[in-house]
Amino acid sequence: MLFKNATIYTMEQDPFVGDFKIDKGVFTEIGKDLTANEGEDVQDLNGLYVFPGLVESHCHLGMEETAIRFEGNDVNEITDPITPNMRGIDGCNPMDETVELALKGGVTTVAAGPGSANVLGGTFFAYKTKGNCIDEMSIQNPIAMKAAFGENPKRCYQGKKIDTRMQISALLRETLAKTKEYILKKESGKDVDYDQKLEAMIPVIKKELPLKCHAHRADDILTVIRIAKEYDIEVTLDHATDARCIVEQIKESGYPCICGPSFGHKTKFELKSKSFKTPGVLNKAGILVSITTDSPVIPEQYLSLCAALAAKEGMDEYEAIKAITINPAKILKLDNRVGSIKAGKDADFIICTKNILDTQNEIQSVYIDGKKAV
């Protein structure tokens, strides 16, 4: 199929008015004055805008269902602060209406998983937002291991297993050390009892899976960096609310930041520095940054609004769009498939009446894998 005369934001080059082709679920050609093959369908998008499908790098979409209480809340397993053996895919209901609303908002790929009650909460996975079977929608499982620092684990286990930040770090270090020992015993051929929790942590130690680290306060962000360097593991700095005051340390670490959710009330002390200025400051410093809704904290369909507010607060407009397309794809290591319009990549794209950051924009169509989903 050939689409012509659109203003195309490929996120691989400057926007231009041109054409693109899709076939068998992928982009095949992007350029100007493309000609249709015999019998090929052609759509004229004159006056319209095309963007890659939006990518959400941190959420709980489908795990905390809408208009329901505990029955549909499968975000946190608050029975033990160390639960790396939990799998986000087992708690995700893709038929909840929030998934469809995200799709209508142009969000085509999300990374979803457990919340931040536990020091180690379980695995995140990535899925496309069209379908009714999560196994068929999933494109990478697992994609990260959730970890959490600061107020949330302290609050959830206060007076029981955690009272201080020291204990949070100690529990994480203990699990990492036990996993390294577990690996050594297995690889040396020694008899070792199967341990589901340590098995889940093996990809983290082998740097096959990053720790997805919930950290708002500056000292917690620096603790993440400290432990990551100690154990030579990959991490992402999720939320990164205080990141503006430790920009140089974050830049030196080389770890990416997932900023947000920045819309709404500052409901706890950790959020006192919450601001839409943060993504722009980090981006200008050369740090790879994406913007998150942390849905359902902010409904997923407002991901583009969050990017617009970041642009309003000083982030370059094009960089703000990158922060909800190619940047999260890079952070999730899915940029070989999604996040930009490029030959060979999944044909996930949205057709808009205006720039995606314009609050008056209307999304006319959403395509996933070359098929019209909205």
What are these regions (language model features)?
Residues 66-67, 73-77, 83, 210, ...:
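His/Asp/Glu-enriched, well-ordered alpha-helical/loop segment
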Residues 81-87, 95-130, 138-152, 208-211, ...:
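Divalent metal-dependent hydrolysis catalytic cores, especially in the metallo-beta-lactamase
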Residues 88, 183-275, 290, 330-332, ...:
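Active-site core of metal-dependent hydrolases
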